[in-house]
Amino acid sequence: MPLCSVLGGPFMAWDAGRLTGPDGEDWRVPVSELEARRGRLAAALAEAGLESALIDDPVELYWLTGGRQSGMMLVGADGSDVSNVHWVRKSLDRAHFESGGDDSPDPVVAQPRMSRLVDALRAVGATRAPAMLAGKVPHDRWEFFAGHLDSLGATADCTHLMFGLRETKSAWELEMHRESGRINHAMFEAVRDVGGVGRTELEMAAAADEVSRAAGFGGRIRMRRWPMDCDRVVIAAGRSGAIPSYFDSAIGGTGASPISSLGAGHSKVVAGEPVIVDMVHLHRGYVSDCTRMFCAGELDFESMTRLEDMAEIRDSVVASLGRGDYCSEAWRIGSGKAAEMGYADHLMGMPPNQAVFLGHSVGLELDETPVVADRFDRELPVGGTMAIEPKVLYDTGAIGTEDTFARTSDGMECLTMGAKWGLLTEWDA
């Protein structure tokens, strides 16, 4: 790979050959992927009656450009005279390399000053203000851009248009999810190997973290919903599983401290008590989300019955999504079955802290759409990826299971461990 020149006082050279995966792999997004994504966005903009979109959110930039350098991507609608351009503030050289180098689908050039932005837009064919991501851009930044673009008219919102495009994954993206699931499996093996009586949740989480980091996890789980942030290893031993948290999910765990009040904490494994392990890995940005139960010694009959019931609810939700039911119908089926089993006041939490979903879409973010919840009156699209996670909480702890699935033309494909790993793993007591 080439040496790239950068300006840092005197001219320096940096080695692009270091921008690889853990074993020297080229981890750039294929140029064909970037071309296809920009083409889909151009078609969607035309259908929505928008002339162009100016994208500057890091996640959406990665999806469109293959990197998350500081900058903006302008995409013109099909049939418009707007030419695509990737404007970069920092680092231009790295953005050029990450988007394919000389094979990059569109020009990668220095970002204009804000005082010249309208002139730059007009130079590439824009006659109207480009749409932007009102659902992601901070209010002050939105107002700042709107003020600079007012000579081109009002700025429209294209947030849900972008979200809709990313709901359907390409074949390449699905393979990223599968590899993420394979690494997630290895994380569970690490927890199995180090866990047992007396081990703290954080000790077990550290073992899983080591596997994930070695495989290339970058340290950040991205979420859409403000003010959510996520510790991607939630391990809750015994009664820790019943502790509520800010996180919009069934379980939160104790966390390590009040500022980190989600995930693994200082509680220890006790013989006979349920230990729930819910772990996320990102492979080149793509999420896998999986949950399994552990116990030192034998799990009591009542808890085991609850676990088997959660697996039955999971199967009913997966079957519903696979045959094309609306996500709201999958929710009604799953939550209705839970109510019939006697879990209405314990499903996905305990009052008043119950979450009201049974599955969430995943991709480059943990909390994508659609969701298995009321009012999501649409299907999971073919190519959509979703984590299905029925769980119940009691004062004795949390019980549940979770795998990540993709909808295919033939039904639902499990992208994580699925049947390869049982519902319960027992450590020696």
Label each residue range with its predicted role.
Residues 2-429:
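Active-site neighborhoods and metal-handling regions in enzymes and metal-associated proteins
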